[in-house]
Curated annotation (Swiss-Prot):
Annotated NCBIfam families: tsf
Gene Ontology CC terms: cytoplasm
Lineage: Bacteria, Pseudomonadati, Campylobacterota, Epsilonproteobacteria, Campylobacterales
Domain of life: Bacteria
Organism expressing this protein natively: Wolinella succinogenes (strain ATCC 29543 / DSM 1740 / CCUG 13145 / JCM 31913 / LMG 7466 / NCTC 11488 / FDC 602W) (Vibrio succinogenes)
Gene behind this protein: tsf
Name listed for the protein in its UniProt record: Elongation factor Ts
Amino acid sequence: MAEITAQLVKQLREMTDAGMMDCKKALVETDGDIEKAVEYLREKGLSKAAKKADRVASEGVVSVEVASDFSKASLLEINSETDFVAKNEQFKELVAKTSKLVHDHALSSTETLHTVSVDGMEFSEYLQQNIAKIGENIVVRRIVTLETKRGAIVNGYVHSNGRVGVLIGIKFGKEGSKSACVELARNLCMHAAAMKPQVLSYEELDPEFITKEKVALIAELEKENEELKRLGKPLHRIPEYISRSELTPSVLKNQEQKLREELKAQGKPEAIWDKIVPGQLERFIADSTLIDQRLTLLGQFYVMDDKKTIAQVLEAKGKELDDSIEIVDYVRFELGEGIEKKACNFAEEVAAQLG
């Protein structure tokens, strides 16, 4: 029979969070085989893991997996309780294995993930084992997989700190455009990681939300204008509109007519109006879509060329390739967004863990 040393018992206890005597008994029953001892203690380990599930997991990592032919990409967020555990090698192995599992099975639902087999068991059981070994609550919070057909690609990017991940799918018409679209999608993913657009297009913004945001935005600009006025600096223009969704054909037609009347009043020759009006109308649209510039990917100015919006970048790339280029999918995960972490003092936290 193998010798059951104190060091072996300690190692098993650290792996499973089970009691000292339970660990010793498990090692005796399994003749000192620590892997079998972990299996022997699974139910006790699961009991410990269940207690850990009450604790908030708001740290962790965002992971991206992209197929070599850019036909498929997966994005997932796995949460732990502390940043320390998120840097643990065992946790990293869990993330890598889960990411590959999600990608290989093209999963977009955590419910489905928990029923998929890994290492000879359902993922839910595999996860509980890792919770017991690592010693913290771990949650696969959300997953998504994007798949494309011929004439489209999907690419992804995860920021070096593992806190932000983005997937973008682009559709094109000519096979020769593929490599350029792969590169463009990667660059746009990096833009989105930094600039935090919430949705792809203004069409996804709820009208009621826009109305509320307009009130808040105007109040913000008026407050800033008070300070600018005090400093003797130019004031912000207070917009009548803040989203492209508000710029109906009649609004744009009326604005164009207003611009022509202004040019007439200024004595500008009518022959040059058609050269001036488009630029002024474009400026009006830019000044009237402030919420789109903040919250929508297509409405934001590109970080690599701040003279163009992402929509204009796509249009320019399409002309360059003599093709039609369109973003068809956009997903962005930021670690812990929307998770409310409980406030707890140190003494309470220790008592909770002991109890």
